[in-house]
Each structure stands twice: as structure tokens, then as C-alpha cells.
């Protein structure tokens, strides 16, 4: 076990094993409760999220997660409800059994077009709790195949085929219209409704593929400094296009869809500095 503060090679950060002991007991408890049956989707998430809690201990490393569930997974849809409660003295406390779920966003994925009421309910739930997001897979896949579905009309046609005739028919349409593709590449193209860890970029089998500019560290009046910051971020993230991934599926994903991005954080502070 690495001692606290030791530098980690690869993607960086420092070790902090302070939560490691808790991780093993939590995982043992989760698995013990499921003896004789399959884990539920939420229990699977908790296994990953408990590891994330361990990683961020000491606030010197980061973890981000996106959990995508089937559209009809009712347990997942309500997993974060009643996360907080008040005792008789009015003090708020978090449910210790659910605490780790805060480490990831929960999104239900629709492969057919959701009704207006479904969308309204999802947005309303997000307004009240910050959770309850839904995703329309055909649109995500269409956006992620922009190299072949080059305009809105083609994307609309794909979405219509996928929604009304199913994923297999949409797959055949892509292959006959723009292929032939290998089965492996076709599988990858049709699975591009996955997300990078913070959800900025659609795709499949991603590590974090984003560089971030901290706007709150930049002078709002210094345009040259801003250009240099974003240029540095672009050069930094471009390194991932040459990173030697150990896992084959990550290497294949980069081969089929070599996408990286630049984003920013601290916009609110940036605007305060700029406008008061």
C-alpha cells in the first residue's frame, strides 16, 4: 500500500490510503447481503462508488462517474430519493447506506422516444433534486457518428429508423449506406451513447479525455492570457491521442473514435471578476 502523499504515475495525483480499510468492509457488507442472488443495478453502482469515495479521500485526487440505467429501472430512478433526512432536532443527516451514491450522476437511457410527460417529469425531478436525468440514445448515437451522418436530415432519418424500427434496423441502415464496416467497428458506432466520466463528450469506452481551463485563475481583461490557457489545454489533452492504454478496448475506441476536448470551470467567478 502506497504511503499517503506518494506521487502516482500515469494520470497523476497522490496516494491517500486513509479510507482503504472502510472500503473492504463496505464491499464485504454489500456482497454479503446479496448471497444467493444477483446484485441489483444500484448495488453494482455502490461497489464502484465506494471505490470512488476511497479515491477522493483527503481531497488530493478526483473521481467522476456516470451511471446509465435502463429506462424502466425504477430502483435506479429513485435511488437518490430521501438521501438526506432531519432528526427530531432539525439536524440534517445523510443516509450512510446511500452516501456513496453521490459520487456519480444517474441517468436512464431511452432507446425509444419518451413521451412529453416522461420528459416533463424528468426535468421537474431534476429541478427539485438535481437528479432524474434521461437520455435519448438514438440522438446521442447520431451525434457521435457525425463523420458519416453529416447533416441534420441524415441524423433525423437515423433517429426515426432507430426509434420506430429498432436498433438492429438502424445498424443495418448505417452499414448499407456508409459501410461496409467490420462488426467490431459497427458495434462501437452503435454504442456511442456512453459518456466520458463527467459527461461532456459522447462515445464508447472512454477514459477522461478532457482538459479543463480554470477561468477563475485568468484575468478577464487579458485576452492573450486566455488564448494561451486554452492552447495549453488543447496541447495537454492531445497527448491522450498517443497514450499507451493497457486495455485493448480503450486502444480500439481511440482508433475508431479519436476524440478529445477542452472545457472550463470557474465561469461564475470569471464573470464576477469581469463584471463585479
Predicted regions located by residue number:
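Flexible, glycine/charged-enriched surface loops at secondary-structure junctions
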Residues: 34-46, 55-67, 240-255
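Function-dense linear segments that define catalytic or interfacial modules
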Residues: 1-9, 125-275
